[in-house]
Amino acid sequence: MSIIDAVILGIVEGLTEFLPVSSTGHLILTAGLLNLEQTDTLKCFEVVIQLGSILAVVFTFFERLKRDKQLWIKLIIGFLPTAAIGYLLYSHIKSLFSQNVVVYMLIIWGVIFIVVELLRKKNPPENEILTLDGISYKQAFFIGLSQCFAMVPGTSRSGATIIAGLLSGLNRQTAAAFSFLLAVPTMFAATFYDTYKNREIFAANMDNIQLFLLGGFVAFLVALFAIKMFLKFVSRFDYIPFGIYRILIAFAFMFFVL
């Protein structure tokens, strides 16, 4: 992996981690276009750049996270289902990883996004929840439970949680914001658990630490931009463009990678 490869992959991770388009699918597609094989080194690199993206959420919402205890309770409630299922089914989840599965999930969840938005337009929700304060513990649990679907590669963690938020009565911007915040405990836990389970592989790749840190820093900067732009976008528009994009990128995946 070259410096240019590290920068490109960091940009892709930062742009796609919090958009409902599957960062995993985009990283696989990009790696294929760069002629990078799915090696242990690349897997370690992806863990590090994911950490960079998580830190961007912490930075963006730092003041809210620092002072809002109720929000933390909701995030913990949302995190628990994923933590339990992820711990129990870790090996099985990892065995699901395949490029074909990624393509199927890109298409399936793309269609789901389109259908959910069309149904919302036909039957607008009453008493939409407009703020994070309005989210109940029950809704937080339901949204957190939806993260379990995202364990299947190509689903998109943000995609699953945003759809669950919309179905729970949250408006688009609040659904996105809670999805981003829920990533903090979820992705920190996943990152550290992955690092622990693969500690020998990480130790063997310490020669690449500078590339890893470069990619993580790039992902952090790009994710800062992506989070702010995405929240502005969904305050004005719906999620149908993302559903269409997922389907298009699935076909690109089939053409360039499979």
UniProtKB/Swiss-Prot annotation:
Q: Which GO terms describe its molecular function?
A: undecaprenyl-diphosphatase activity
Q: Name one GO cellular component term.
A: plasma membrane
Q: What class of enzyme is it?
A: hydrolase
E.C. number, please?
3.6.1.27
Q: Where is this protein found? A: Cell inner membrane
Biological process according to GO:
cell wall organization; peptidoglycan biosynthetic process; regulation of cell shape; response to antibiotic
Say if the entry is tagged with keyword Transmembrane helix: yes
Membrane topology, as annotated:
Multi-pass membrane protein
- UniProt entry keywords in alphabetical sequence: Antibiotic resistance, Cell inner membrane, Cell membrane, Cell shape, Cell wall biogenesis/degradation, Hydrolase, Membrane, Peptidoglycan synthesis, Transmembrane, Transmembrane helix
Task: Please list the reactions this protein catalyses.
Answer: di-trans,octa-cis-undecaprenyl diphosphate + H2O = di-trans,octa-cis-undecaprenyl phosphate + phosphate + H(+)
Q: Which InterPro entries match?
A: UppP
- Pfam families, sorted: BacA (PF02673)
Q: Report TM segments.
A: 1-21, 42-62, 71-91, 96-116, 134-154, 173-193, 211-231, 237-257
Q: Which family does it belong to?
A: Belongs to the UppP family.
Give the note: Bacitracin is thought to be involved in the inhibition of peptidoglycan synthesis by sequestering undecaprenyl diphosphate, thereby reducing the pool of lipid carrier available.
Which HAMAP family does this chain map to? Undec_diphosphatase
Tell me the function of this protein. Catalyzes the dephosphorylation of undecaprenyl diphosphate (UPP). Confers resistance to bacitracin.
Know the name of this protein?
Answer: Undecaprenyl-diphosphatase
* Species assigned in the record: Campylobacter hominis (strain ATCC BAA-381 / DSM 21671 / CCUG 45161 / LMG 19568 / NCTC 13146 / CH001A)
